[in-house]
Amino acid sequence: MAALLRRLLQRGRPLAASGRRVGRREARLGTGPGVAVRVRFAPSPTGFLHLGGLRTALYNYIFAKKYQGSFILRLEDTDQTRFVPGAAENIENMLEWAGIPPDESPRRGGPAGPYQQSQRLELYAQATEALLKTGAAYPCFCSPQRLELLKKEALRNHQMPRYDNRCRNMSQEQVAQKLAKDPKPAIRFRLEQAAPAFEDLVYGWNRHDVASVEGDPVIMKSDGFPTYHLACVVDDHHMGISHVLRGSEWLISTAKHLLLYQALGWHPPHFAHLPLLLNRDGSKLSKRQGDIFLEHFAAEGFLPDSLLDIITNCGSGFAENQMGRTLPELITQFNLTRVTCHSALLDLEKLPEFNRLHLQRLVNNESQRCQLVEKLQALVEEAFGSQLQNRDVLNPIYMERILLLRQGHICRLQDLVSPVYSYLWTRPSVGRAQLDAISEEVDVIAKRVLGLLERSGMSLTQDMLSGELKKLSEGLEGTKHSNVMKLLRVALSGQQALSSMFKVQG
């Protein structure tokens, strides 16, 4: 970069010229015939994927699929100081787990790669060179100490911190002298023009006079890495992004991005800024909340469809909110023009109910049920292992029957290996004192039950069993039918309360 600056000085190019302005384009949905819809999800690998990121990725995915477009994953990893090992792999893994895999990504590749910004530095250098040549950018030699003093002084005066543009109007001689001492200056973008108004597809018409409230922003750091503002503009242009769907926190930055597009002579994409996903109490989702990461939900047995369902149910973009929507239904029903400016409040206490609906749907699908049986077998092995007195409980037919009987009653597959359902897999340990506390006629009742089973055998139906059980307490002083049923429940399951005694016995 220093060599380029010296060449510009030698050629006598003006460092104070302004960038070229392109015509304002009417903002519209832009999904008509012949339009190649290309959207991107561009997280920073500074942490693992969480629900807020999943929602942004999902809206991009369903928008792309609704219009037969492409969904791109781009990792914005230019801030090397905040890089978290394993985060890049986790983001792509979790998108695939959620059922919304990218069409192009660091792992999958594609025609617009590479898909990690740290591997695209040459493109940013070329854009910076173009901006320096037209005078739309200039070198900044201010030290971190000076910038920190500016910030503290502004805060002391109750003002918004901003750069004072000190290096903007340096002469060629001054720049040459500075370069001799500091060959790696930062590069700032000159905010001289009024930012154009633009029509956001969610928030409507916007105009932000960024130059009146901010100093000239850094677009290239002294280490040769770009800042977000330059990198996202360069990447969206070279990757052919048609629509930028991102969080509303970036709405105010769009003015800078449009000025960069103008200075580089490029047409901007359509912008749609999505309202934030907040906690139920209105607070922001935070990476400090350990339970908002997708890995947590996957480990806890929540289904991807239930997460996609709840994060769209609490927001907007659909004609109505309803529970139980699948991904194909989300794609069909999604309408970007229905996304409102209101933040979405996420109530995770409702997630078990969403998961119950989606789990029940899978149980009722034969092929999906077979996959659930395999997962349940692994869960039972892991939970009970050597405690299994009879490995016949791992028989797929038995497990399939359990799933069909308990569908609608369980919220997660893991519920079936909780202590409440342990009787399905192991014999309960019940002491004689526990049985005697229910009835003094334990032995008599046991003999009557055995006799009933020997007489009826496999021909015993639920209706027959119900009638026969009512006879078990006949002639037993101090023992009611309720005592008999409680005794059987404890003997069979180790619990005094079960949803259906007859299904357990069956």
From Swiss-Prot:
Gene Ontology molecular functions: ATP binding; glutamate-tRNA ligase activity; glutamate-tRNA(Gln) ligase activity; tRNA binding; zinc ion binding
Principal subcellular localization: mitochondrion
Amino-acid positions noted as binding ATP in the UniProt annotation, renumbered to this chain: 50, 249, 284-288
Modified residues (N6-acetyllysine): 486
Family note: Belongs to the class-I aminoacyl-tRNA synthetase family. Glutamate--tRNA ligase type 1 subfamily.
Function, in words: Non-discriminating glutamyl-tRNA synthetase that catalyzes aminoacylation of both mitochondrial tRNA(Glu) and tRNA(Gln) and participates in RNA aminoacylation for mitochondrial protein translation. Attachs glutamate to tRNA(Glu) or tRNA(Gln) in a two-step reaction: glutamate is first activated by ATP to form Glu-AMP and then transferred to the acceptor end of tRNA(Glu) or tRNA(Gln). In vitro, cytoplasmic tRNA(Gln) is slightly glutamylated, but with low activity.
Protein name listed in UniProt: Nondiscriminating glutamyl-tRNA synthetase EARS2, mitochondrial
Organism expressing this protein natively: Macaca fascicularis (Crab-eating macaque)
